[in-house]
């Protein structure tokens, strides 16, 4: 009897559940058949939610990929530089293990070492790891690119020059050698540049030396000076003085004519002028032609050419007004001039000046 009583409520419960399920199915069917807009709305919402979930999954995947790539790049940089303490840890490592921050900053120069780093160093027996040895042996780019063999030991010189004075002395010696080589090279270039003008000057000096050999000797110049001093002292000059002065005047005229024949006006073909000028084309013209063209903007006519130089009349001054023109003043001026041993041309020019002074004095004395 008891078993039959227990089976009866179980059957009743199962029947009630089945009836409830059937009622719900009927309700859903009636609602679906009654409202199609709600069904379409639910469908669109499901599609949008699925799209959003897929996009969120893609973003998460990309973030994980970027984080992993960044960690790889940091590890590569740390392996190349050989110092794991220069770069901060990644955010994932700091979140996962906070103790790693203390480990990474344990061996920093600017901070006090932690107990963990000190204990780890003591456990290793104070010996460096093979990774640190390798990083120490790696040469810097400066030492690798340096042409000097001893420059590889200068890694610590930049920070502390007194720690390795031998390397510092080697560097100073190398710098001095480079400076000496540069100075020698510069000196050689200057000598090569100076050789060309020196050769030109030597060739120019040879020509006047030949002309000097043809000039009168120093003894002849001394005799001329003696005769001049006798003339100023009041003694009558010997006939040799007149001959020498005439010869000197003739030779000076020949020299002036030879020198002036080189210069010639391109407009009027004159060879005597107070100053030489250049026209617009760069040709050589006399002073008169140049001034005429500047004033009238036309070339000077040929019929206006003059073979002599026109001089303005100047007021003649007496000897009292101008004592510098007296014989004593002229003689003292001649004695104060430079020596006559440089060449015969200087003596000839002095003779011409003396003749001109004598002529001017005679003209003043004449009524």
From Swiss-Prot:
Protein known as: Transcription factor elt-6
A molecular function (GO) term: DNA-binding transcription factor activity, RNA polymerase II-specific
PANTHER family: TRANSCRIPTION FACTOR ELT-6, TRANSCRIPTION FACTOR GATA FAMILY MEMBER
Region (Disordered) location: 1-24, 74-134, 177-264
Effect of disrupting the coding gene: RNAi-mediated knockdown at day 5 of adulthood (earlier RNAi treatment causes worms to become sick) causes extended longevity and also increases expression of elt-3 in the trunk hypodermis; longevity effect is suppressed in an elt-3 mutant background. RNAi-mediated knockdown at the L1 stage has little effect on the average number of seam cells per side, but the number is reduced in an egl-18 mutant background. RNAi-mediated knockdown at the embryonic or L3 stages reduces expression of lin-39; expression is reduced further in an egl-18 mutant background.
Signal peptide: none
Keywords, in A-Z order: Metal-binding, Nucleus, Transcription, Transcription regulation, Zinc, Zinc-finger
One GO term (biological process): cell fate commitment
Expression across tissues: Expressed in the head.
Residue stretches of biased makeup (Polar residues): 92-103, 211-243
ZnF (GATA-type) intervals: 265-289
Top-level taxon: Eukaryota
Short name of any one Pfam family annotated for the protein: GATA
Function: Transcription factor. Binds to the sequence 5'-TGATAA-3' in regulatory elements of target genes, such as lin-39. Involved in embryonic development and in vulval development in larvae, acting redundantly, at least in part, with egl-18. Perhaps acting together with egl-18, may form a positive feedback loop to initiate and maintain lin-39 gene expression to ensure proper vulval precursor cell (VPC) fate specification. Together with egl-18, acts as a downstream target of the Wnt/beta-catenin asymmetry pathway, required to adopt or maintain the seam cell fate.
Regions of compositional bias (Basic and acidic residues) in chain numbering: 1-16, 114-123, 193-210
GO cellular component, one term: nucleus
Subcellular location: Nucleus
Disulphide-bridged cysteine pairs: none
């Amino acid at each position: 009897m008891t078993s039959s009583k227990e089976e009866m409520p179980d059957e009743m419960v199962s029947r009630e559940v089945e009836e409830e399920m059937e009622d719900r199915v009927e309700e859903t069917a009636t609602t679906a058949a009654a409202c199609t807009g709600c069904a379409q709305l639910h469908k669109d919402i499901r599609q949008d939610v699925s799209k959003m979930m897929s996009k969120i999954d893609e973003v998460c995947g990309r973030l994980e990929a970027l984080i992993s790539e960044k960690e790889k790049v940091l590890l590569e940089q740390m392996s190349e530089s050989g110092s794991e303490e220069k770069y901060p840890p990644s955010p994932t490592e700091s979140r996962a293990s906070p103790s790693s921050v203390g480990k990474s900053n344990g061996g920093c120069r600017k901070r006090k070492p932690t107990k963990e780093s000190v204990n780890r160093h003591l456990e290793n027996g104070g010996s460096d790891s093979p990774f640190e040895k390798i990083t120490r042996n790696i040469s810097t780019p400066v030492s690798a690119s340096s042409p000097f063999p001893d420059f590889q030991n200068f890694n610590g010189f930049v920070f502390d020059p007194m720690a390795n004075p031998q390397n510092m002395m080697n560097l100073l010696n190398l710098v001095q050698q480079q400076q000496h080589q540069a100075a020698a090279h510069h000196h050689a270039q200057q000598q090569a540049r100076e050789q060309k003008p020196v050769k030109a000057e030597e060739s120019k000096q040879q020509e006047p030396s030949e002309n000097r050999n043809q000039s009168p000797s120093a003894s002849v110049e001394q005799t001329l000076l003696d005769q001049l001093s006798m003339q100023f002292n009041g003694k009558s000059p010997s006939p040799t003085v007149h001959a020498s002065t005439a010869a000197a005047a003739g030779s000076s005229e020949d020299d002036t004519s030879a020198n002036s024949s080189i210069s010639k006006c391109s407009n009027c073909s004159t060879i005597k002028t107070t100053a030489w000028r250049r026209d617009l084309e760069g040709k050589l013209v006399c002073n008169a032609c140049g001034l005429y063209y500047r004033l009238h903007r036309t070339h000077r006519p040929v019929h206006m050419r003059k073979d002599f130089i026109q001089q303005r009349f100047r007021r003649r001054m007496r000897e009292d007004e101008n004592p510098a023109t007296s014989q004593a003043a002229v003689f003292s001026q001649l004695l104060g001039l430079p020596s006559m041993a440089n060449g015969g041309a200087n003596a000839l020019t002095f003779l011409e000046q003396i003749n001109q002074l004598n002529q001017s004095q005679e003209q003043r004395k004449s009524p």
